[in-house]
Every structure is written in C-alpha cells, then in structure tokens.
C-alpha cells in the first residue's frame, strides 16, 4: 500500500496491476484500508445473478476520508419485472493510520450496501451477502515479484433480521500479474451468516477474482464467488462482472 500512496495527479487512474497509481478500496465483497485520494472519484457497476445490477459512486473528499452512495436491484436485465433494492446504500471511510515499513494501514468505515439480490422472503430483510456495516480494515503491501497486498478486517453488519448479529471477520490477498492485471482471493468467515434462520451453511465464503486495467481509468473485473458453496443450489460458484472507472476532478 505504501508503494501506491505516492502518485501523479492524472485525469484517469487504475488500481490493477503493477502499474497501479492508486490503492484498491475493495477486495471482492469486503473493504480494504485503501483510500480514494482527495478530488478523485470512482464509478462502479456490478452485474450478478437474476439480472442484477448495482451502481455506485464514491468521492475522495480528503486524502483521509471518502464517501459514496450506491443503488441497484434485480431483473434489471431480462424480461421479468424489475425489483429495486429497498433503499440506497451509503459508505464512508476514514484512514486512521497510514502504512509504515513495519505496520499496515488501518481504516475505520461504514458500508450499508450488501451484495447480490435482496431477500425479503421469510422476513429475512437482508442481502444475499450481508453488507459490511461498521468495520475496521488493515492492509499491507509487499514487494514480491511485483506487488503482494494482504488485507483483513472485522465488521458488524446491521442486517440482523435473520437472527444472526455476530461480529464477522475476513481476509484477502491481491497479487499483481504484470503491469495491468491483479488476482484476488477473499475469505469471508461469515460468522454472521450461520444461524438457524441464516442462509449460510457454516463454511464461509471463498471468493476469487481478476482485475484488468484497460487504461484511461477503466478496470474490468471477473469474480467467481462462493467457491466454498456456503449456500444451497451452488454448483461451481457465482459468476459476476465488475466494471470501474476512476478519475480526478
């Protein structure tokens, strides 16, 4: 992360590959300690099961603080009636400590946006993948055949109607592969998704991903989520598409 903190003021930038100019703010479903710098913005879109689309915008208000909003729904792509999420998601992140040679960067944040379809049946009132809620994240970068970033965090989601309100934890790694590509792996322990009424099977969520910078601020991502089959009716994994554009004012 420290190697990514110093960057030139470019109109459009990327967080993927060894040529990355900014810090990645997310793994796959979970946040890192990475920040959008002041006067930078990120426009993201995620495409998932049941014709789902989620669009978000985040802005770096200061080097140490960012804010964003997101909204989406299911059946947006396809012939069925569109089902929008009950409310927009909001996120805010504050960098507590910058990375040093010995210590990781730390950030405190809030993110109410869950992933995948919103579930109202049986009074669950939650996303398929719960939102992070309140979280603290740590990130450390190492020079290893390019860049190797290690991330982890603790989070407490506000989605508790399924009866599972436990504190959760997650880990992740990012490895650059050449100047434009990063490979991601994320493990969500899902301690808050293994109650009797929850939909998790107690194995946690193992997610794999790829991020590819196409230049001029455009990043394309492909994810294979829930490889651990932590929910019913999953044969291989949940395939999703992710598109980001990052620029500066």
Q: What is each of the regions a protein language model found here?
A:
Residues 12-150, 155-159, 174-182, 186-249:
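Transmembrane beta-barrel domains of Gram-negative outer membranes and organellar outer membranes
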């Amino acid at each position: 992360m420290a190697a990514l903190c110093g960057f030139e003021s470019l109109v459009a930038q990327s967080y993927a590959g060894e040529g990355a100019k900014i810090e990645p703010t997310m793994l796959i479903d979970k946040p890192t300690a990475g920040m959008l710098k002041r006067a930078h913005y990120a426009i993201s879109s995620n495409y998932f099961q049941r014709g789902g689309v989620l669009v978000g915008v985040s802005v770096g208000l200061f080097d140490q603080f960012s804010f964003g909003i997101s909204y989406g729904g299911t059946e947006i792509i396809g012939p069925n009636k569109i089902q929008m999420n009950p409310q927009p998601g909001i996120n805010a992140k504050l960098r507590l400590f910058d990375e040093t040679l010995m210590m990781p960067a730390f950030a405190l944040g809030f993110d109410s946006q869950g992933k995948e379809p919103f579930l109202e049946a049986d009074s669950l009132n939650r996303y398929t993948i719960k939102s992070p809620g309140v979280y603290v994240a740590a990130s450390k970068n190492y020079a290893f055949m390019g860049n190797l970033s290690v991330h982890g965090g603790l989070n407490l989601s506000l989605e508790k109607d399924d009866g599972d309100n436990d504190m959760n934890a997650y880990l992740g790694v990012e490895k650059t592969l050449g100047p434009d590509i990063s490979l991601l792996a994320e493990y969500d322990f899902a301690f808050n998704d293994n109650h009797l009424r929850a939909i998790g099977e107690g194995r946690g969520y193992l997610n794999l991903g790829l991020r590819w910078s196409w230049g001029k601020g455009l990043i394309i991502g492909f994810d294979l989520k829930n490889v651990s089959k932590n929910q019913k009716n999953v044969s291989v994994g949940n395939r999703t598409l992710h598109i980001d554009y990052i620029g500066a004012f």
